[in-house]
Amino acid sequence: MKGGGFYQNQYLVPNVYFGNSSPVIAPIGGNALNNNNNNNNNNNNNGNNNNGININISNFQHQQHQIHQQHFGGLSPNMNQNHIIQHISHHQHQQAQQIQIIQNNNQPQPQQHQIQHQQQQQQQIQQQIQQQQIQQQQIQQQQIQQQQQQQIQQQQQQSKMNFIRGHHQRNSSFDEFSLSDVSVGSFKDMGWEEIYFCYHHFTQMDEGKGYLKSFQQLIRYITGLYPDISPSPNSQFLFSLGLLYPNALPQVQSPNMILSLTLKQMIETYSYTKSMVYSGSGSGGGNSGSGGGNSGSGGSSGNGTSGSGGSNNGSTIIINNTNLNNINNNNNTNNNNTNNINIPSTPPILRSLANGASSTNINIRKFSPQQACHIIDVFNSVKDNKTGGVSTLKLSLFGADASLLPLTTLPFHEFVQYIGLNIIPFENLFKPPPPPSSQLQSSPPIESQHLFLSEIDELTNNNQNNQNNNQQQQQYQQQQHHQQQQQQYQQQPQPQPQPQHQPFIYFEDTSNNNSPLDGNFNNSFGLFNNNNVVNHSPLGNNILNNIQQFNNQNNNQNNNNNNNNNNNNNNNNNNNNNNNNNNNNNNNNNHNNNNHNNNNNNNNQNNIFNHNQNQNNHLINNHSPNQYNNQGNILKNSGSVVEPPSQQQQYFSDIEISFSELKISSKLGEGTFGVVYKGLWRGSSVAIKQIKINEDVNNQVLEEFRKELTILSRLRHPNIVLLMAACTAPPNLCFITEYLPGGSLYDALHSKKIKMNMQLYKKLAIQIAQGMNYLHLSGVIHRDIKSLNLLLDEHMNVKICDFGLSKLKSKSTEMTKSIGSPIWMSPELLMGEDYTEKVDVYAFGIILWELGTGELPYSGLDSVQLALAVTTKSLRPPIPNAWPYQLSHLIQACWHQDPLKRPSFTEILNLLNEIP
């Protein structure tokens, strides 16, 4: 057994590898010696032999010593015990140090701890980033949903916009009916003055380009249309423009933005703005700022853009009724007083009607904005580019009565005025094929008025001018007479019956809410007889025949001119040479009662001027056989007085149609007065009410019925159902109204059970009161107001139907002595006593109660019990205590037992506005 085995196992240096399998000897003393010896072994011995021998001997001895150490486990056998103990303790100390080093290596270092902390922070940051990404995705999804909702809302708004644009088509049918929709504004009909001012101001602003290119031009255009309103309704006009034409104005608006606004857009926007500017009356009647208050050419009120002569220009443009403009001033010679009128929300013309002005008999036609554009288009297609007007001879193409027109060139304001007076039938207007260079907006000056104004002092040849005009007119009348005789001769031996004048009663009406003024001024056709005119719509299919007929007429006129050896041409030349003097004379003598030069004796009793044995170059236009004072319609360079129409034509020629024109599609309902059908008339959806009558209906009753229909057909109000036509030939006795798809208020309250709130309650109540107020001011008593006779349109607007027709109702097969429904009937009606318009006020009180409760009053009582309780015991429905005091007080006042103590609808409107 080899020595040193224990020590070899106990004193090995751990974790040390030297490349061989022999154990490592623990270091002992003499290491320095051994190292020196090793170093010495590597040295080259260059000394003497003796030194080399000694070195070799010492090395040999050292090798022997190492051999002995290896045999005894690294301990020299010559070492004593102390050396061994020291060696062991030293080795243990080294081993303890190595263990400490190993433990220190196993503990985490501070740098590693920081790295781990940073890694944890990075993980947290990554988690936060992931959460943020998730939130962003959720936000993006929400944004996508919001965008989709906005697109849906925009589509809904676009559909509403499309409805507003087509709002003028009153009889259009709609597939959907919503009780929550609310309409915004509507188109309003325009008078000839408004059409002229829209056209005139546009031509002053467009710089000959046919469109407004800047925002400054647009603002000046709006200001010119409303000279008497301060400040101008710019916001309402721009709002209407945005509704009708969303892309007309840039989204980012600035004073320097570039526009391209056409005359058609301006006219339609002006018509739509009327419903907002004059919202107080709910009618949007005439606009004094656009013709009503400016009777000069381009505004003699001082605010017009082209008028500079004040009241001296009155002969160029004469407003239909000067007194309507000067409400508080009887002096017709000073139109500048219109600026002193404070313009409230109600138009001045409507205020004059409410004040009892005698203008209810004036028959002035009004036009939709589309019709106005058609008039302008026709004018631009037939006018002379040199003079800017239309020759009177050209007007024969449109069936105009040449005897009522001056033998001069008509500027635009006279052209449109003659159309407004129906001297030039609007239905016969058509646009001839234009030359390639003509456009609707490319319009030279519409009147050469400056020629007359520049030579106002040249009045030397007035007598000669009048003689020339008289000769020219006589020759023209002879030509017309000769032409009529020739046509009558050609029609023999079987003379054709005279064509009945059946004008377009309802052409492209643009408003679901018409003006109350339309009842007095609108759609009054057939004022003048024209035996040789066949009326056609400008959009019809008979234009070629119409052109051919008038071409034949022109050929006859040319032949007559040749037979007269050019005398007519000579007279025309004289007239043209002296035209300025004639107009100057008219301008100076416009308001001078003693200096008028007349062509014909004035036989009109209603002339506002006192003409006696003088000759007149003005046309005194009185449309109705009824006498009225202070009414005049004077045109420039005219030479005759318009004869009033016959009584028969005045009463029903405009409203009566043939039953064969109607196409009945379905039955809507049936009542005691008649059966209501849905049908078609001239391409529009209408409601046809066929009347139940007895056999004892004689001609006198039918005549009264026709007269009553004529009055009712002229009623125009946004809350009145439009009466469009009627058939007055038994047994097919019926009348035609506009069709409202919303049904009756009765069905909405008691069948559909709509949810009523105060906002909707006030809206319905105010609209009913507005319609009834208009009827009463027009002299019409309804006598049968009830929820069944209140119809609704698509946007929950109320329209009153089944009014008037008292003569025919009394002959109904199932009507009793008392006309109406017992629930809504007043005590005086139930008792068969005399009654006034206050019977409608009583019924309105019952309707207010019905609106608030959604129920019918007097449940459990039959008609006899109800009549006795209402007349003898003053029975009324109970009013809930939770209702506002103002509303309760109003209802009690409306159904008061004494008719004299019931308020008028004018007072009712004021009280309704006070309800919170």
Swiss-Prot record:
It catalyses: L-seryl-[protein] + ATP = O-phospho-L-seryl-[protein] + ADP + H(+); L-threonyl-[protein] + ATP = O-phospho-L-threonyl-[protein] + ADP + H(+). InterPro entries: Kinase-like_dom_sf (IPR011009), Prot_kinase_dom (IPR000719), Protein_kinase_ATP_BS (IPR017441), Ser-Thr/Tyr_kinase_cat_dom (IPR001245), Ser/Thr_kinase_AS (IPR008271), Ser/Thr_Kinases-Pseudokinases (IPR051681). The keyword Zinc does not apply. The active site is at D784. Keywords: ATP-binding, Kinase, Nucleotide-binding, Serine/threonine-protein kinase, Transferase. ATP binds at L668, G669, E670, G671, T672, F673, G674, V675, V676, K689. It comes from Dictyostelium discoideum. One of its GO terms (cellular component) is cytoplasm. It is an enzyme of class 2 (transferase). PANTHER family: MIXED LINEAGE KINASE DOMAIN-LIKE PROTEIN (PTHR44329:SF298), SERINE/THREONINE-PROTEIN KINASE TNNI3K-RELATED (PTHR44329). GO terms for molecular function: ATP binding; protein kinase activity; protein serine kinase activity; protein serine/threonine kinase activity. Residues 623-646 have a biased composition (Polar residues). Residues 283-311, 461-518, 550-646 are annotated as: Disordered. Pfam families: PK_Tyr_Ser-Thr. Its EC number is 2.7.11.1. Residues 662-916 form the Protein kinase domain. Residues 461-493, 550-622 have a biased composition (Low complexity). Belongs to the protein kinase superfamily. TKL Ser/Thr protein kinase family. The keyword Kinase applies. One of its GO terms (biological process) is signal transduction. This is Probable serine/threonine-protein kinase DDB_G0267514.
